Amino acid sequence: MHIGTRLGAAGLAAALLLPTGALAAGPDQAQARQEDLDTLYAALQEHHPDLYANTPQEAFEAKKAEIEGRLAEESDVDFALDLQSLVALIGDSHTTTNIGSVLNSTGLYPFGAEWYDGSWVLTGAEEEDAALLGQTVTALNGVPMDEICTRFGTLVSADNPVKLRRQTEQLLYSEACLDYLGIAESGEPLEVTTSGGSFTVEALPMEDFGDAALSSLSQQRESTPATAYRKGTYYFAQSLDDTTYYIQFNQCMEDPKQPMDGFAAQVEAELEAGDYRQVLLDLRNNGGGSDGVLVPILMLVPGLVEEGVKVYGLVGEATYSSAIINAVELVDAGGVLAGSPTSGSVNHFGSTGSFTLPNSGIRVSCSSKYIDLGTLLEAGLGAQVEPLVPTVRVEQTLDDYLAGRDTLVDWLLANGADYTAPEQPDAPLTRGRLAWMLWQAAGAPEAEPAPFSDLMPFAYYAPGVGWCDQTGVANGVPGGAFRASCAVTLEEAAQMLVRFVRQQGLTPAEVRSCLLYTSDA
């Protein structure tokens, strides 16, 4: 097998993005670098919504002074990594320097490791070391893997541990990064220690790396599951069996060959023609884009749930950015999340813009706002900058990977249709849920869509909010919003209940019955 799909330029580009120009050289090199450093810090101060949210200003200025002390002597590559290490202090996965092409000019070690069963597993090696594939990687040059992740935390842009681990995985074979972090020395071999023995590798120039022969663990797979990631495919749907319908959504982008409206119509027709008990929406390999693309599919979810169909959103460590928003939206629509914690954080900085440093040509992506999903979606209420953790926790195992099985999908095929999500008795009562409960108590009459700017039309509580608005049971707030995801105050709850009683013309006995109904709903 030739390196080039999992490793090489693609991995580095994914970790630190792309492209840059040539760095300045000559007697004015230090001055040019100083200008770039000053420009970077000033632009971050001006454009980032909360630069010092995770690291105090003093630490930024100390790091900047440290970098200034070596501007005249360090290499172009180390200067680029210095810039990224300054950006890493923000603790924002979306704000990063795009130095992938700088790293692509450096050496790459011909091996690979990925995360399975709670440890690092050797997934790529030169042919003479292929017998160690599948073994646990414990150290590089004697540095334990946990310590290596910690060191990468000073270099990469990551706002949660899952994102840090993925960034580490994508840069683990970069000679320049390992040298910068004191794990390896450029020009010297790297010792890889596994549970089955150790071996050494020499870094290869990028131009030779793509042609190097590498044995891969993927070559040992017995088969590939029907739900395997289809790289390059925006979305597709298929029946897995008579009871399970599967949708793979890989990019939050419209497929030019099949716009989402048409795809959603196809899905709806196929669901109506079948007798499915569960629908799986797979977001495990979706790295983001525009969260609005999925709305036509999300609009189908409340009706399915009402008919007794279980709807699962499948998430994993590659679920990121707008795909996180879609996953939380799915829960608000009545779905359940299954899989493993995500690299994308529920609340996060995002909506990026960019600027370019004047001398190096390095482009910097910078967040422009903080996205707090709890202000829009009930399922995001109380969340922090943290991975999205699914209700159903099922991790892909190495044994299943090698056997060609999808651990999560197999579990859902066996258990999903009959699974009942645990109750959340401590969850706060939101304005949206109370509106839904009162609408249900009224018999769930037909209601026009509510006009509120912050109300998602696919949310399970949307009809209730619409009915409450039309009947005067509940009103919006200034600015045309309803704040459905916010916890209802005692005053708001009392007002809504009093208005509901009047609207329904209830007797005292009926009021008591209604209160018992809503408390049990």
What are these regions (language model features)?
Residues 33-36, 56, 60-63, 79-86, ...:
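Stable alpha-helical elements in mature extracytoplasmic
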Residues 41-55, 71-75, 87-90, 94, ...:
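Sec/Tat-exported extracytoplasmic proteins
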Residues 27-41, 196, 232-420:
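C-terminal "post-core" interaction segments
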Residues 414, 418-464, 470-491, 497-519:
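Feature responds to low-complexity, polar/acidic, surface-exposed segments characteristic
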Residues 20-22, 517:
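Short, low-complexity export/processing leader segments characterized by acidic and small residues
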Residues 11-19:
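Bacterial N-terminal signal peptides
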